[in-house]
């Protein structure tokens, strides 16, 4: 079995199509207004329509109002929600789709905090990211050994932060995650994906057999 790959911050139709063709399992569409990868609803809906039958399209939100999230899920046909802000456990349900809760990691205390989301509401997975300024997409990594703190939690874990084609295989070997997530590590500019880098990232990530 190989790791799942999510490419976040897609803004162009051609990049979305190329990512699916490269073997990506999920795309993240950014609805955080302060992000350089922010999308309006018509653009996001068009990108979501590129989804193949077994693909996942997540909407990425930062401290957004629940009604805004629900409206966006309906308008764009999202299949999951990623909460990437300071949302408490009680905010992780009520959107009609599974929730991935992202948490910035600087030390063991953040992994302890991550465990408070396990089994709560509609949380279907946890995404551990580096603590870059702002919320995500900063290309900052974290100590991969901390992922072991979620061993036995029963919740799928995705690793993000500072990943790129040259180090993602190492990250998969070190953490044995359910998935890996990349944004800036496969870009030529914020929101502009380098298709060759996406292909190389997918090849490297999926070259590791998680059952070995």
From Swiss-Prot:
Family: Belongs to the TrpF family.
Gene Ontology annotations of biological process type: L-tryptophan biosynthetic process
Domain of life: Bacteria
Family annotation (SUPFAM superfamilies): Ribulose-phoshate binding barrel
GO-annotated molecular function: phosphoribosylanthranilate isomerase activity
CDD domains given in the database record: PRAI
HAMAP family assigned to the protein according to its UniProt record, in alphabetical order: PRAI
Name of this chain's protein: N-(5'-phosphoribosyl)anthranilate isomerase
The UniProt record lists the keyword Metal-binding: no
Entry-linked InterPro entries: Aldolase_TIM, PRAI_dom, RibuloseP-bd_barrel, TrpF_fam
The entry's keywords: Amino-acid biosynthesis, Aromatic amino acid biosynthesis, Isomerase, Tryptophan biosynthesis
Pathway: Amino-acid biosynthesis; L-tryptophan biosynthesis; L-tryptophan from chorismate: step 3/5
Record field: catalytic activity: N-(5-phospho-beta-D-ribosyl)anthranilate = 1-(2-carboxyphenylamino)-1-deoxy-D-ribulose 5-phosphate
EC number(s) on file: 5.3.1.24
PANTHER family documented for this protein: N-(5'-PHOSPHORIBOSYL)ANTHRANILATE ISOMERASE (PTHR42894:SF1)
Class of the enzyme per the UniProt entry, highest EC level: isomerase
């Amino acid at each position: 079995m190989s790791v799942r790959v999510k490419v976040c911050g897609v803004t162009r139709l051609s990049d979305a199509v190329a990512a699916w063709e490269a073997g990506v399992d999920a795309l993240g569409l950014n609805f955080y207004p302060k992000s350089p990868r922010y999308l309006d609803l018509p653009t996001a809906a068009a990108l979501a329509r590129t989804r193949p039958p077994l693909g996942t399209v997540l909407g990425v939100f930062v401290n957004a109002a629940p009604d805004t999230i629900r409206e966006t899920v309906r308008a764009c046909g999202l299949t999951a929600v990623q909460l990437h802000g300071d949302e408490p456990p009680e905010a992780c349900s009520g959107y009609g789709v599974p929730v991935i809760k992202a948490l910035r990691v600087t030390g063991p205390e953040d992994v302890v905090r991550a465990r408070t989301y396990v089994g709560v509401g509609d949380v279907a997975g946890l995404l551990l990211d580096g603590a870059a300024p702002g919320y995500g997409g900063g290309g900052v990594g974290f100590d991969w050994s901390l992922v072991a703190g979620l061993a036995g939690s029963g919740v799928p874990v995705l690793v993000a932060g500072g990943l790129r084609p040259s180090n993602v295989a190492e990250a998969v070997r070190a953490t044995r995650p359910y998935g890996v997530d990349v944004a800036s590590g496969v870009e030529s500019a914020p929101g502009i994906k380098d298709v060759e880098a996406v292909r190389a990232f997918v090849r490297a990530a999926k070259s590791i057999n998680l059952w070995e």
